[in-house]
Amino acid sequence: MTMTPALNPVIAEHLAAVNAHDEDAIVATFAADALVNDAHREFWGTDAIRRWVAKEMVGDKVTVEVTEVTDHHGQTIVRGRYDGLFDRSNLPDELILTNYFTIRDAKIVTLIVIYNTPAY
C-alpha cells in the first residue's frame, strides 16, 4: 500500500488560497525572492509573482484539485486537476499539471508548473 505524504503546511495554505482566489494570501506563501516558472515563463520576486497571480490565477478563477503528492529529496511534487476560465486551446478536457515546490523557512522559494505528457 502506498501512502500519500501530507502536504507541507505552506503548500496546503497556498492551494487553499488559490482555490479561494485570494491574491494576498497566495502571494504571502512565497519568499520575497521566490521564483515561479509557469508555461516556460519566469516570475522572480513577489512583485512579479503578484502580477502573475492577479492575472492568471485569480483573474482566471483557477482551482486546483490535488490528485497526487510525492516528496522527492526535499522537493514536494503535487499533481493536480486544474480548472478555471483560462484559454483551453490545445489542452485536454481534464488538465493535470505537475507543481514542483521547494520550501525554505516555511515559504515557497521555487514553484515550477509543468504540463507533463507520458514519456512512452
Regions picked out by a protein language model, each given a short descriptive name:
Residues D33-W44:
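A short gly/proline-enriched turn/hairpin at secondary-structure junctions
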Residues D24, A32, V109:
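Glycine-centered loop/turn positions within well-structured domains
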Residues M3, R50-Y120:
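A beta-strand edge to alpha-helix "cap/lid" segment located at domain peripheries
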Residues V27, T46, R50-V53:
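Short, well-structured alpha-helical segments
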Residues M1-T29, Y120:
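Short, low-complexity N-terminal intrinsically disordered segments enriched in polar/charged residues
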Residues E13-A16, A39, G59:
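Short, flexible active-site loop motifs that bind/organize anionic cofactors or intermediates
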Residues N19, F43, V78:
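Short glycine/serine/threonine-biased micro-segments
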